[in-house]
Amino acid sequence: MYQVDFNHPIHVYFIGIGGISMSGLAEILLSEGFTVSGSDWNRSALTEHLEKSGAHVNYGKPQKAENITDDIDLVVYTAAVHADNQEFSRAKELQLPMLSRAEFLGQLMKNYDTPIAVSGTHGKTTTTSMISEILLQANTDPTLSIGGILKSIHGNIRVGHSGLFVAEACEYTNSFLSFFPKIGIILNIEEDHLDFFKDLADIRASFRKFAQLLPADGTLFINGDIENWQEITEGLACRVVTFGTTSASDYYPSDISYNKTADATFTVHSLNGQTRQLTLGVHGEHNISNALAAVALSDLLSIDYRDTAEALLNFHGTDRRFEYKGTINGITIVDDYAHHPTEIAATLHAALNYPHKTLWCIFQPHTYTRTKAFLPQFAKSLALADKVILADIYAARETDTLGISSADLQALVQKEGKECFYFHTFEEIEDFVLKNCINGDLLITMGAGDVVNIGENLLSR
């Protein structure tokens, strides 16, 4: 495998430079004096920022072979790039060194004394952001690579000068097995990405391999609510610390209460028997576990708890995580990235504690594979809303070979006893909302695709 010498800048080309992680890696290289170029289908705020910082970006679909020139020293590509991609094929033809995004990020981690990798089926971006805010509050000068936009740094990347490096670690295509963490976090393990993994056992095996990456002087924080979590940690040389919802874990909460906007206050019970109070600035019960992971890590790093508590109180989430978008005709519009049944349920449970008359959920299913695999679970989770509106399935990297559509999900939601409407276009959905939602209603757009545009379109009308 090609080894990058980060002390000697070269020309790196990113296929898919506009992705949230790829754009962050590109920005790190620009800050270190590298020549950066790349391609993406469409112009975005992320690519425009890179261009202003000195990168050259080629736009268009398909990405063209002539973009790959022999002055490029290294090509970095995402998991979404297939062998028939013209740029990918041309780089192979020219025998240019090539690394996947995960391989490149793994090599970057090696340059830091304390690389921290945050993994789990759900909650990675929120927890990575919580940790980031704590490290910033404590003036530790960390380098951060986040899967969402963190408002306090006006982006998803921060280049620091200490030995701390924090990054999300995604299990899809076993990407996180290319990393070199000293500290690892496993937030949860559930079925997902079944276009790659065979089943839950296959996913658990991948997380076990991730845990085995940690060195003997490292630490793994794992959610003690994960069923048979000991199977993941058995035989590890590193230290293992648990967090969870019950006293069986090393870190756990008690005396939980919520304010009128569903933010939690609770007592944190710690490994050493210490108890401390914590109030979160984000909504929902699921964020208690995320916060406990962040607190446990902060204790390991000997961060003053006053900094930890202040950072978590002032953290109000990243973009697309229960993000307040605005109000139109007295209708509150919130957007959320949830695209898995567990995430949907967590978001809607949080919304139920938020002031509202009728809770509307506009859901855009993400990928045919996931929709087919979790169809009954999606219906049960969506039925937590008072009324549901469905958009067409967002294909992402897939083509429809499964014969599945949002109409199948609509039928199951209706069987759960809830009104469910299905429209093929965003314009139809927007018109329906304006005719049927009333003052005091709460409207959540939900999904990992472009469903966020519905709320933004409504607010601009």
Where are the model-predicted features located?
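Conserved N-terminal Rossmann-fold NAD(P)-binding element of oxidoreductases
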Residues: 12-17, 446
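Short acidic/histidine-rich motifs immediately flanking catalytic phosphotransfer sites
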Residues: 69-74, 163, 439-441
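Phosphate-binding loop of NTP-binding sites
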Residues: 5, 28-34, 51, 65-68, ...
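NAD(P)-binding Rossmann-fold cofactor-contacting core
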Residues: 35-49
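Nucleotide phosphate-binding/pyrophosphate-handling subdomain across enzymes
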Residues: 2-13, 21, 25-32, 112, ...
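C-terminal helical cap/extension that packs against the catalytic core
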Residues: 379-439
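Beta-strand->loop->alpha-helix junctions that form or flank phosphate-binding loops
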Residues: 39, 58-62, 99-106, 145-148, ...
